[in-house]
């Protein structure tokens, strides 16, 4: 496995500068944001002429690969929510937002193809996450599932044309957020290979899910991994629960995102289970830890994870007792 960096953490720096920083610390991959207006990747520009080859060559010059293109915001508005909740992503009517999100996700797949990148990470959206509870409208979740099939099925048709896979990141406020909803989504999509997951263990322990269960149940569908931790703050969780509101730096929170090794994710178990299901791609570090700087995060993360990576599989026993 390789350890990579999600460059969205460093949008105030030029991409070449970020690549130099990551490479110098021992990172081997970058995950590039693809949403409109970000300075690291302009989808329209990269699809012109030889720009994709030029960009890939620049990144490769630092000894890095591009593990994925990430487009969480624009994927979100395919299924919602709409209104002012997502005006920062794209202002407009519900129909205008769906159209924009759909077109942008297809263009992200096109750019991934041009860059030789096998996967796009992102969100699928969810118009009303509160519908996980069947009152006051018991068919609300089923309605959203049908919209998921209709809208994302068309997007995935284009992903198939471009030879790119989509890795949804299970997360609160998404139609797919846990093991059961992930398995259900595979069923809804008819098992098509373009549909899979960006496994982020922090998002799962947020909801008290054993991350090993997700790895084992979704084997063959994990196309990308985020190296992010989450801390269950034991002295607060009995008061606020796992889904507290308010500032992420608030002392009373029962949960907060952390860098790997500083939270509650069992990393030795994660890095045992992933090879067992055949995952040998990238662990992409994403900095969302509000307790420490980016410099702390980027240096501490690789120092923590690198020694945990299993370099070679078990060779078997060859003594007489095991013949």
What annotation goes with each model-predicted range?
Residues 294-314, 321:
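C-terminal helical cap(s) of enzyme catalytic domains, especially alpha/beta-barrels
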Residues 17, 61, 76-197, 295, ...:
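Active-site acidic/histidine proton-transfer and metal-coordination neighborhood
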Residues 29, 119, 224, 281-282:
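Residues at the N-termini of beta-strands
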Residues 33-56, 60, 127-130:
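Glycine-rich, proline-tolerant flexible connector loops at the mouths of alpha/beta enzymes
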Residues 19-24, 46-68, 110-116, 153-161, ...:
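Acidic (Asp/Glu)-rich catalytic clusters
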Residues 11-22, 99-111, 207-216, 267-270:
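Short, acidic/polar
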Residues 6-10, 33-35, 71-74, 125-127, ...:
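Active-site beta-loop-alpha junctions enriched in small/polar residues
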Residues 2, 19, 29, 69, ...:
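Acidic/histidine-rich catalytic cores of soluble enzymes
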